[in-house]
């Protein structure tokens, strides 16, 4: 049978999602816990391979197993064998043609900036601190130039392995909740470091170092060296993955927790 899981994790102490030799990853911890429940080796496939230090509130994975377990056992049993910073949120049986990555039609990320002169001791690895005052309205206005299908070479990591830089951005919203600025972006898919590179350049606009139209110009140049530095991993969350309704993938609050109702 094939099972899909919803996964939440604090990526602060992990070297990204993907299993690697000699360092801890989220995938490694999840596979170890699932293998205990299944009493057999389990390999998982995820919707989006997040980088070192990046978090997830809406990650989706699937795995195949011959072990017959109640769905609640895949949740409670796995959580009992996971560290406190990784948790299974739900489990469903899915059809054989479901794939956590290739069946997805969109991914959604949120980047959280604590915009205050003094840093906060709360969630030091859960938000990115930026002490200069940022104009979130200008950041939002600039972000609208990125909507639709475009070549995102200017916001693509140098070592990106994707065959094409073209992606379709469905929405990009920048809002403020007190001292927190939230960059909310959804696209069919993302090139490597795309969200953090976009945020880095939007910060330049928000601080007033560049005009709103600079983002439009950057997009047209298709040159990563002209854009701002990559924003820190702290503050980035994979919050949602979209699938066709026929797969029956549950929808939960987007998160992170302190933004769950916004």
Swiss-Prot record:
Enzyme class: isomerase
Chain sites annotated for binding substrate: 109
UniProt-listed CDD domains: PseudoU_synth_EcTruA
Keywords per UniProt: Isomerase, tRNA processing
MF terms (GO), sorted A to Z: RNA binding; tRNA pseudouridine(38-40) synthase activity
Enzyme Commission number: 5.4.99.12
Pfam family, one: PseudoU_synth_1
Active site, UniProt feature: 51
Gene Ontology biological process: tRNA pseudouridine synthesis
Catalysed conversion reaction: uridine(38/39/40) in tRNA = pseudouridine(38/39/40) in tRNA
Coiled-coil regions listed: none
Subunit structure: Homodimer.
Protein family: Belongs to the tRNA pseudouridine synthase TruA family.
Function: Formation of pseudouridine at positions 38, 39 and 40 in the anticodon stem and loop of transfer RNAs.
Protein name: tRNA pseudouridine synthase A
Underlying gene: truA
């Amino acid at each position: 049978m094939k099972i899909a899981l919803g996964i939440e994790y604090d990526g602060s102490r992990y070297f990204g999602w993907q299993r690697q030799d000699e360092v801890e990853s989220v995938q490694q911890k999840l596979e170890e816990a699932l293998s205990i429940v299944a009493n057999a080796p389990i390999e998982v496939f995820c919707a989006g391979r997040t980088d070192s230090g990046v978090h997830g509130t809406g990650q989706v994975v699937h795995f195949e197993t011959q072990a017959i377990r109640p769905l609640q056992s895949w949740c409670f049993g796995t959580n009992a064998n996971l560290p406190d910073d990784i948790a299974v949120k739900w489990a469903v049986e899915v059809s054989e043609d479901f794939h956590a990555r290739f069946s997805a039609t969109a991914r959604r990320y949120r980047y959280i900036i604590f915009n205050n002169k003094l840093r906060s001791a709360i969630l030091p690895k859960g938000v990115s601190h930026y002490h200069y005052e940022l104009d979130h309205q200008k950041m939002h206005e600039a972000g609208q130039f990125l909507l639709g299908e475009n070549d995102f070479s200017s916001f693509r990591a140098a070592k990106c392995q994707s065959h094409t830089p073209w992606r379709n951005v469905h929405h990009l919203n920048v809002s403020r909740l007190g001292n927190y600025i939230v960059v909310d972006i959804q696209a069919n898919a993302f090139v490597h470091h795309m969200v953090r590179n976009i945020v880095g350049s939007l910060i330049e606009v928000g601080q007033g170092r560049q005009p709103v139209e600079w983002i439009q110009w950057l997009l047209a140049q298709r040159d990563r060296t002209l854009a701002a530095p990559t924003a820190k991993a702290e503050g980035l969350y994979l919050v949602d993955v979209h699938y066709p309704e026929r797969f029956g993938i549950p929808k939960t609050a987007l998160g992170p927790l302190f933004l769950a109702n916004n």
